[in-house]
């Protein structure tokens, strides 16, 4: 579930914001659309007759344009202000070191234990770097999917999809996912 992965969810959010901006033409509306939807913000701009966020925020009425939608952009600006000078608001902050990693695209479906063995990478490292992989993958009841961008520590940057496929071997590569058991 890539929603659990801060890197993938950030990429998806950036893509949505870029789309909203292309559709709406202003960053305040694009950011508000992240909460309210691009169609909803387009409707608001058309009804009010402007793309000016302040005017829309003060005059647009809709049963769905409530507190969260009205305050999404101002909340973003507040968070941005804090991010630009966090020490002013929180005092001294100890920052975690930058996470460095390398990604390879899974060439086929494969078991996590086979991947771990082929790469010679500890399971904890794989788990920490791949939060989108859920418990069934780690327990072995599901496979890491083909096309998944497997994140490895930067020290493993010599690995490619092709090298992984060779290291796994044909008996450890699968064309499809393990079928889920259904309970009656």
Question: Where do the model's predicted regions map?
Answer:
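Extracytoplasmic and endomembrane cell-envelope/extracellular-matrix remodeling and assembly machinery
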Residues: 1-23, 28-184
């Amino acid at each position: 579930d890539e929603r659990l992965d801060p890197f993938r969810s950030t990429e998806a959010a950036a893509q949505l914001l870029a789309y909203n901006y292309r559709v709406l033409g202003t960053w305040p509306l694009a950011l508000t659309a992240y909460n309210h939807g691009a169609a909803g913000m387009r409707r608001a701009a058309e009804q009010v007759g402007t793309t000016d966020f302040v005017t829309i925020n003060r005059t647009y009425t809709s049963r769905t344009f409530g507190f969260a939608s009205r305050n999404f952009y101002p909340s973003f600006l507040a968070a941005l202000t804090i991010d630009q000078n966090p020490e002013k608001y929180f005092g001294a902050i100890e920052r975690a070191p930058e996470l460095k990693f390398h990604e390879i695209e899974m060439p086929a479906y494969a078991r996590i234990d086979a991947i771990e063995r082929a790469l010679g990478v500890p399971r904890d490292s794989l788990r920490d770097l791949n939060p989108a992989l859920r418990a069934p993958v780690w327990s072995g009841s599901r496979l890491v999917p083909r096309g998944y961008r497997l994140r490895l520590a930067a020290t493993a940057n010599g690995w490619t999809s092709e090298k992984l496929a060779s290291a796994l071997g044909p008996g450890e590569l699968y064309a499809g996912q393990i079928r889920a058991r259904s309970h009656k």
